């Protein structure tokens, strides 16, 4: 059986003052994941499976009802990082039964799981005018960081408040942060394959120096065409048009004429791996 331990939280180059972190330690075993976790908790991913899933699996992941055919991907459901995050969050309530517990965002994008946490009196940080109101958090409160992680500024705020951090950030996400940090130290611009408003991408961008976020191949093709002066598909975008298109998806002071000379690629882990690889290949062919 695993147990929860209170340990210093790594700073990940954010400058945090080592707030406390509730983590899991297992008694042994192996896993193909970066961090093996075995926890006995109230969370069971099987609860979220339905009869329709069973039917699809029994019929080669495809079934037809009337004139509608439904196909199921062979890799589906909660990934191990999600299982891990929810298990740690559930265990946190057991570890701190009388403490006030907050969470900075939805633990995962699943209404049933999030409702269960609300029933366990895990409260959302309130948002006003698009800004999180961390003033509701008091010294000594417990704050859960979700599977997607949290931005550097949020971690610094919580560190200064001397709260107890329950860090459920997926290890695959922290690997991306480490890559982005290397880009920053090497004075590379990070091209992030993701959605600029997604919590994970917001967190990843906060670890970057210069960055631009592209959602798909169309957007990265636009970027490459700008770099090549319209030679790729003839769009011949102006600097003004470029900045208008990516006004919510670039770092402060971003200059496409200067900041796209040397770049590295990172991704939001929920994006398609194959598309990220295609984006990286296109950039390497057109930029160098």
Regions found by a protein language model. Name each.
Residues 2-11, 17-288:
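The feature marks the mature, well-folded catalytic cores of soluble enzymes
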């Amino acid at each position: 059986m695993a147990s929860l331990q209170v340990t210093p939280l790594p700073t990940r180059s954010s400058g945090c003052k080592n707030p406390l972190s509730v983590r899991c330690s297992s008694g042994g075993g192996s896993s193909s994941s970066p961090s093996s976790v075995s926890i006995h908790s109230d969370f069971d991913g099987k609860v979220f499976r339905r009869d329709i899933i069973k039917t699809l699996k029994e019929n080669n992941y495809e079934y037809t009802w009337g004139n509608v055919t439904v196909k199921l991907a062979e890799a589906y459901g909660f990934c191990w990082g999600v299982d891990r995050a929810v298990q740690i969050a559930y265990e946190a309530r057991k570890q701190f039964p009388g403490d006030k517990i907050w969470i900075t965002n939805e633990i995962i994008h699943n209404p049933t799981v999030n409702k269960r946490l609300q029933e366990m009196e895990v409260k959302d940080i309130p948002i006003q005018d698009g800004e999180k109101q961390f003033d509701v958090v008091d010294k000594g409160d417990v704050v859960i960081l979700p599977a997607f992680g949290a931005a550097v500024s949020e971690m610094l705020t919580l560190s200064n408040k001397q709260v107890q951090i329950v860090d459920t950030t997926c290890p695959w996400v922290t690997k991306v942060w480490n890559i982005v940090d290397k880009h920053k130290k090497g004075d590379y611009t990070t091209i992030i394959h993701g959605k600029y408003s997604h919590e994970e991408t917001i967190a990843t961008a906060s670890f970057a120096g210069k960055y631009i976020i592209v959602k798909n191949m169309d957007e990265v093709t636009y970027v490459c065409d700008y770099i090549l002066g319209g030679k790729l598909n003839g769009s011949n975008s102006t600097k003004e048009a470029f900045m208008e298109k990516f006004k919510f998806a670039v770092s402060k002071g971003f200059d496409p004429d200067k900041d796209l000379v040397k770049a590295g690629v990172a991704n939001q882990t929920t994006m398609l791996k194959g598309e990220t690889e295609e984006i990286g290949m296109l950039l390497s062919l057109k930029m160098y």
